[in-house]
């Protein structure tokens, strides 16, 4: 339970709470600047997340389709400095779990995508088809992180955006950070400490975020105290 899934799941549920009615459609979008330093496991997980088949929620059913048949030319505007960014759709575990959350029980459609600064979009089809190429690129990125971080043109920026909609309203939840490491570590630590302190009632077992009864406003205040500031736009 770190950045995705974890913090992104919280942002989906927090946006849904502001909507105040059942969510029918949802989107998760993440922007990674090329200067953001990430761990080896995080890099591998990111590249392995967009294999040749794409998992998404469509008409309330989990489907697997070829990425070329699903909005291959779609773009997204994160903010005024990051507009019309081409997207790489990926299979988040939240596709399988989000409907467990009470406000998402009637969810019809949900997909997840990210933009990685400076990644040539022309190489994406090859990455999807070849495990060897994915592993090769992962090794290259991991080895060159120091150089990428020093390059002033590479942004040290992570932007997380969740959208939820119903027939009448749209709510956007937005977060800016300079470190995916920090987002992952802080969210995980906050959840564990909240459980230890008794703020989150939980039985022994294995649970996803959607399974846990959490006061979302309380959790948001704790995150604010850790300088993780999430904004809401309605």
What function would you assign to each model-found segment?
Residues 14-234:
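C-terminal catalytic/substrate-binding lobe primarily of soluble NAD(P)-dependent oxidoreductases
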Residues 1-16:
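Short alpha-helices
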């Amino acid at each position: 339970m770190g950045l995705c899934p974890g913090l992104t799941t919280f942002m989906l549920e927090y946006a849904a709470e502001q909507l105040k009615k059942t969510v029918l459609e949802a989107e998760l979008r993440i922007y990674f600047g090329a200067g953001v330093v990430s761990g080896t496991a995080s890099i591998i997980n990111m590249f392995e997340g967009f294999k040749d088949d794409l998992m998404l929620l469509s008409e309330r059913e989990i489907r697997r389709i070829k990425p070329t048949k699903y909005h291959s030319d779609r773009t997204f505007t994160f903010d005024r400095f990051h507009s019309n960014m081409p997207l790489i759709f990926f299979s988040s575990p939240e596709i399988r779990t989000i409907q467990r959350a009470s406000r998402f029980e009637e969810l019809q459609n949900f997909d997840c995508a990210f933009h990685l600064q400076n990644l040539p979009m022309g190489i994406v089809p090859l990455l999807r088809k070849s495990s060897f190429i994915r592993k090769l690129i992962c090794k290259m990125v991991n080895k060159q992180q120091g150089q990428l971080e020093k390059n002033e043109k590479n942004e040290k920026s992570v932007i997380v955006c969740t959208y939820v909609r119903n027939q009448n309203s749209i709510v956007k939840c937005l977060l800016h950070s300079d470190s995916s490491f920090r987002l992952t570590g802080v969210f995980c630590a906050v959840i564990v400490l909240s459980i230890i302190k008794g703020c989150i009632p939980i039985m022994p077992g294995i649970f996803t975020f959607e399974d846990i009864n959490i006061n979302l406003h309380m959790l948001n205040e704790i995150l604010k105290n850790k300088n993780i500031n999430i904004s809401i736009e309605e």
